[in-house]
Design a protein with these regions (language model features):
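Short, Asp-centered acidic motifs that coordinate Mg2+ and/or phosphate
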Residues: 1-2, 69
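Conserved hydrophobic packing residues within short motifs/helices of P-loop NTPase cores
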Residues: 2-4, 49
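Glycine- (often His-adjacent) and acidic-residue-rich active-site loop
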Residues: 6-40
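Crotonase-fold acyl-CoA enzyme core
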Residues: 39-135
Length: 135
C-alpha cells in the first residue's frame, strides 16, 4: 500500500491551517483528528510506502514517519513550520523522532525551517530521493 503525500495538482493537507496562527490551537476541545488518523495508519497491518511529492510538513511529517519506507521526489521539502508561530509539534514528533538523531530532530522542531529531499535522506528521515517523473 502507498500513502501519497502531495501530488502534481497541489499538496494534500493534513492538520490545521497555520495561516490562522496559534488561534487554531487555542480551543477548549482537544484536537484528536490527527491522533485517530495516526492510530489507523499504525494499525493497518500492511507495509506502507510514503511517496512524497511536494511539501511534507506538520501533520504530513507524522503521517510519513508512520510508513515503513519513504520515497521523495527531488523537489520535495520537509519541515515543521508550526515552530515559527510558537507551537511545538507535540503530536507529530512522537512519530518521527526515533528515525533521526536527536540534534536533527531538535533542529526541525525548534527552527521551523524546511529541508530539501536530499538533506532529509542524509539525516535518515526518508529512504530514497528520485526524480519527480519516477515517483
Amino acid at each position: 500500500m502507498t500513502v501519497a503525500v502531495g501530488h502534481p495538482g497541489g499538496n494534500r493537507h493534513i492538520g490545521g491551517d497555520l495561516q490562522e496562527g496559534t488561534a487554531i490551537f487555542g480551543g477548549d476541545e482537544p484536537t484528536t483528528d490527527f491522533g485517530r488518523l495516526a492510530r489507523t495508519v499504525r494499525d493497518i497491518g500492511v507495509p506502507l510506502v510514503a511517496r512524497v511529492n511536494g511539501a511534507c510538513v506538520a501533520g504530513g511529517m507524522g503521517l510519513m514517519a508512520l510508513c515503513d519506507l519513504a520515497i521523495a521526489a527531488d523537489h520535495a521539502r520537509f519541515g515543521l513550520p508550526e515552530a515559527r508561530i510558537g507551537v511545538f509539534p507535540m503530536q507529530v514528533q512522537v512519530y518521527f523522532r526515533h528515525l533521526i538523531l536527536p540534534r536533527h530532530a531538535a533542529e526541525l522542531m525548534l527552527t521551523g525551517e524546511l529541508i530539501n529531499a536530499e538533506r532529509a535522506r542524509e539525516i535518515g528521515l526518508i529512504n530514497y530521493v528520485v526524480p519527480a517523473a519516477e515517483l
